[in-house]
Amino acid sequence: MKKIADEIPAYAYGTAAIRPSPVSLEELERLKISAGFTAEDEQFLRMAGEVLAGQTKQIVDHWRGRIIAGIPHLAKHSRTPDGEAIPEYLAQSNLRFEQWILDTCLRPYDQDWLNYQQEIALRHTSLKKNRADGVTSTAFVPFHDIAAFVAVINDTIKSYLAAQGNTAEEVEGMHRAWCRSLQIQIALWSKAYFDVAKTSNEW
């Protein structure tokens, strides 16, 4: 499995530190069906992983430096409550963001992957945000902002999928598979927010 660095702070994929997902593998399979995700999409995601592997830093810099940084209500989630930058936090979370790209494309969607989807979601809610990096920032990232920003991620990723000379058909296939995967991931992340909603409105 490709990793963007030998050491990725607070990246604990597949370890005992990650608790089991409340979503079952059977439910994951049903989500795949609902999203139209097929074995062909798995193949296209593997292709996408190879195409994107050398571009992850550029992609994350694009998302965070050129887009999120210019949207105050999104940028504040990696800053102090007073709006000051936290460079170390940004650097560490950027590495995890890069690795997430590869995990989306190259990891098998098995129990470890399912468990880590729950961990990703929890780290955006008040239950776990800021803990992994030991910082003081916003208490949570509202779910609606995450769900909405997926549209930007899906739109901007396409040019990177096309950057290595693949055919138009291959680029379309990779992009379709990527979008379906993110639809599944957003559905999975919503579970943590629904659970938190019993005590806190983090929509």
Language model features with spans:
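Short terminal or interdomain "cap/linker" segment that borders an active site or interface and mediates
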Residues: M1-S34, A163-W203
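Low-complexity, intrinsically disordered or weakly predicted helical/coil tracts enriched
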Residues: E26-E42, T80-A85
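Heme-based O2/NO sensor domains and their adjacent alpha-helical segments
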Residues: L31, A53-Y160
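Short, charged/polar, low-complexity loop and linker segments
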Residues: A35-M47, L127-V135
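Polar/charged alpha-helical tracts
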Residues: R46, D61, A168-E169
